[in-house]
Amino acid sequence: MQLTHFGHSCVLADFGHTTLLFDPGNFSHGFEGITGLSAIVITHQHPDHVDAARLPALLDANPGAALYADPQTAEQLDVPCQQVQVGDELSVGDLTIRALGGRHAVIHPEIPVINNISYLVGDGEHPARFMHPGDALFVPDEPIDVLATPAAAPWMRISEAVDYLRAVAPARAVPIHQGIIAPEARGIYYGRLTEMTTIDFQVLPEESAVTF
């Protein structure tokens, strides 16, 4: 598996014959020219996870790609989209994608909680090869190989980021959702996640593929 980070929560997961793009949002850049996608997978409706303005062109460039999103998000998009419910199991190429969780993390008690799907991808080598939680601290009940772990968010303290990484305890982790952190301050967050866990933690260079 190769992972390419396009900033914030946008990650390209290339499994060889099957390629998935997660959360192409408005804080992410460089994904616009991607072709050959098998699927585009959206965790929830917030614009930093799905840029409705750039999505149609991305779909036009990838006519064979399915678009998956929760029902709330699907209803807001002006493009064909397959609605995903918690508990669904999707077959995309030689991959199995499971839809888990269901709810966005609480930002504030006065802000309504929206849908959020955490996606767990299995390949022929590992049933939980890669997990993208979106904006949620969902802890699966099985071992995860590579976790895209939120580094910072309006709905999360750094202590919660550390505790979440400890709770999931993946074999390896890569940080996402760092677009709200000034570049010069990101090392503070990454340092806590590295020093306070025993996880193999790797920061992905933007727009460069890394093999796992």
Predicted regions: what they are:
Residues L20-L21, V41, Y68, H132, ...:
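Structural motif
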Residues M1-T4, D78-E89, V162, R166, ...:
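Binuclear metal-ion centers of metallo-dependent hydrolases, dominated by the metallo-beta-lactamase
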Residues H49-A52, R157, P183-E184:
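Conserved alpha/beta-hydrolase "acid-adjacent" motif
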Residues M1-T35, Q83-P143, W155, E160, ...:
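Core dinuclear metal-dependent hydrolase active-site scaffold
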Residues F27-A69, D145-A148:
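Active-site metal-binding motif and surrounding structural segment of the metallo-beta-lactamase
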